[in-house]
Structures are given as C-alpha cells and as structure tokens.
C-alpha cells in the first residue's frame, strides 16, 4: 500500500480550465489545508464522496483562485485511494501555485503513469486494462478508440480469465493423476484432454493472428510509396498529408532517406512511407536510401508504385522484376502519375502494360499529384485495399506487442502439449508445458510481472495519468 500522497496537473496547458489530481492517504487532509469551502459549515473532510464543493484556494490569506473540488474515498476512486481533483482556471501560474501549495503541505509530484500504476496495484484493473488507458489517450481513429475501450472495460481480460480457467482445469486433472500414479488410476481421459487442448489452442491462435489487424489499426496500415526518381512520390505524400512534409524538386535523387507520417482516411489510420527513388547510382548515401526503400517495401501491406506516365513503359520494364516478387500477399496499386500530360488513348496502352501482373492483388489508377486530380479516388482505393474489419467495442483484437509476444509463447507451449498427448508422453512433461502456458497468459494480466516490466510500462504514460 502506498503511504505517500501524490499530485499532478492532469490537463494540457493553454485550456480555459485546469485540473490537478491528488491521491493517497492524506489527499483529503492536505487539500483541506489549502482549500476553504465558500459555504460556511461542513469542512471538506466531512463531505460525502462523489461531491463537488465550491470554494477558494488560499496561500496564507491570499486567494489564489476560486475552484471546484471533487471528493472520492477509498476504495471507490480511480486509484483505489482517497482522492481529490481540484478544477481551477487554466492559467499556468495558478496551476503551478496550487501545485507548490500541495507539495509544501505534504504531497510529492507524481511519476509518469503513477495514478494508473496505483490503480493496478490496488486491484482496480489488471495490467492489460492499465495499458489500454494509454492506448485510449493516444487513440486517433474510431477503430483505435473502440479497441482501447473494449480492452479497458475488461473484454480482453475476460478472455484471458476464461483461458486461464481452462488451463488450470487441464493441469489439475494431469497433476491429480500424477499424485496417484502408483495406484494406476486415470483421472482424465487422454482424448478429452486433447479436445480441451484443441479448444485452448484455437483461442490463443485466434488472438495471436488478430495482432496483424490490431497492429495495423493501432500504428497505421503501412503504405510504401516507391518508384523511380522524379515519379512524383514526394508530391503525392504532401498531397495526401495536406502539408509540405517532403522536399519536392526536379533534381533526381532529392529524397535520400525514408520519410514517414500518418493520416486518417475514412476512419482508418495509414502510415505513409515516402522512399528514395530507385535508380542506378554511384552515390553512397543515395544507395543506402535505395536499400532502405526495398526494406520498407518488404514491411508494407500496401504498395503505391508511382510511375511517370510519360515514361511508363521504360519504368515498368526496368522495375517490375524487382518489385512484383516482393508484392506477394500485399496490395499493389500502380499509380500512373502526371496523367494530365498524356492523351486519353495512351491510358489504354499503359494499362495494357500490367496485363501480366497478378490480378488478385494489383490495381491501377491515373492521377496528377501536382494538380490533385483523382487523389480522392486513390484514397478510396487505399481504404478498400486495407481490408480492415469494422471494429466494435465487443471485438477482442490484440494491439499490444507485449501481449502478442506472451501469447505467441503460450501458443508454442500448448502446441507442445498437443504433440505430447499424441505421443503419450508422461504427465510430468505435460504439466510443465501447461504451467508455462499459464505463466505467459498470467503475465499479460500482470499477475506474475516483475517490477522492472511494470516500470517500463508506466513510464510511457503522461504525468497526470
């Protein structure tokens, strides 16, 4: 149990209203020392929980501000401790004055994520729910918001609890059998155990495979913009982002390194990657940039191959052997840029250049990035190419790398159990693998997580959370 009382500003600078959170055993008494209710009578410490009290913050006899104080009593608060929230005017001077008074009277400044860490340590939420708080704060689309809300409300935690219950049931049957091994008593039918192992494997496997979707939703669908130099890659990136992110020049090889940025299109976050133009060069730095281009191409889920319409035949012939083999299981959109410089009849001829491309994942479009023609249509194609499901708050989709790694290890363990059952190995070995699986599942919820891991998780939160 935490014996000290913490405080922190919970709102961003520049707003009309500011909020300071105070939590810990002395939260109410420390707040009472600097706060005087406007209505004479009840002191703050005598107020009922979940009440708002209007009054003034004093530094000695000087009034600092007129404020509202919210009161929460343990264990019915966010942290599970006695807590107050002081809502004042948003002046940075006022907020700092109130903070200094709280610290002078016994509070200490909260560490990043300490409020949520205390909520976890006090049993108000498990670790996966605590991590979802950070995801909710960082959410930038409807899908990321829904996934974070689902996890924070305990949807993922319930899935883990059910999974852990099945695993404990499994291992208890195995270990009970081991206790009576000398009496040759079989408590669990091996076919029934195999059926249970299959059920567990299906659940874990579904969660592991959901990470590809979850990671794309959370961090953005990776879209690599590739092509020869001066095909218009940087111009397209600037148009999509609606800002001059990349340098645009007629000089070949201007973009020498990878430029990344994200944008929300139709409720989906896309992570665009503008790459160095592909060409033969003796420039060492440019060569490194081209090498990174192919690395980013391999990592992308959608590839925008920018082709200069006035030189399309040559570019497609030169680069198709390098690009097409790398685009298997990706979505490839061939973007014929500078289409305003060619005749309508030429477009049919250029489209025919793609006749040997794999039709199942290849699309094409004619645009003019400079004139912003057909760029809206390109955005629609990106949405269709993303193939992301419509997400609801009831969906259980893994978005956290730590969870994915733990689930992957749990999946390996349950696979060993399945193989062991098929091979009729001893229950001792089966029990060991099952317990390993339980360990990794429990690690996600924070039931077996060490202090170093906790510190690493919560230090990425903002101070007031």
Curated annotation (Swiss-Prot):
Q: Tell me the keywords, alphabetical order.
A: Cytoplasm, GTP-binding, Hydrolase, Magnesium, Metal-binding, Nucleotide-binding, Potassium, tRNA processing
Location in the cell reads:
Cytoplasm
User: One GO CC term of this entry?
Assistant: cytosol
- Where does the TrmE-type G domain lie? 220-387
Q: Where does (6S)-5-formyl-5,6,7,8-tetrahydrofolate bind?
A: 21, 85, 124, 465
- At the top level, the lineage of the source is Bacteria
Supply the enzyme class, top level.
hydrolase
Coarse class of the primary localization is cytoplasm
User: EC number(s) per UniProt?
Assistant: 3.6.-.-
What single Pfam family name could you report for this chain, choosing any that match?
A: MMR_HSR1
Q: Which GO terms describe its molecular function?
A: GTP binding; GTPase activity; metal ion binding
Question: What role does it play?
Answer: Exhibits a very high intrinsic GTPase hydrolysis rate. Involved in the addition of a carboxymethylaminomethyl (cmnm) group at the wobble position (U34) of certain tRNAs, forming tRNA-cmnm(5)s(2)U34.
Belongs to which family? Answer: Belongs to the TRAFAC class TrmE-Era-EngA-EngB-Septin-like GTPase superfamily. TrmE GTPase family.
Its assembly, as annotated, is:
Homodimer. Heterotetramer of two MnmE and two MnmG subunits.
NCBIfam families annotated for this entry? mnmE_trmE_thdF, PRK05291.1-3, small_GTP
Name listed for the protein in its UniProt record: tRNA modification GTPase MnmE
Task: Say which species the protein is native to.
Answer: Bacteroides thetaiotaomicron (strain ATCC 29148 / DSM 2079 / JCM 5827 / CCUG 10774 / NCTC 10582 / VPI-5482 / E50)
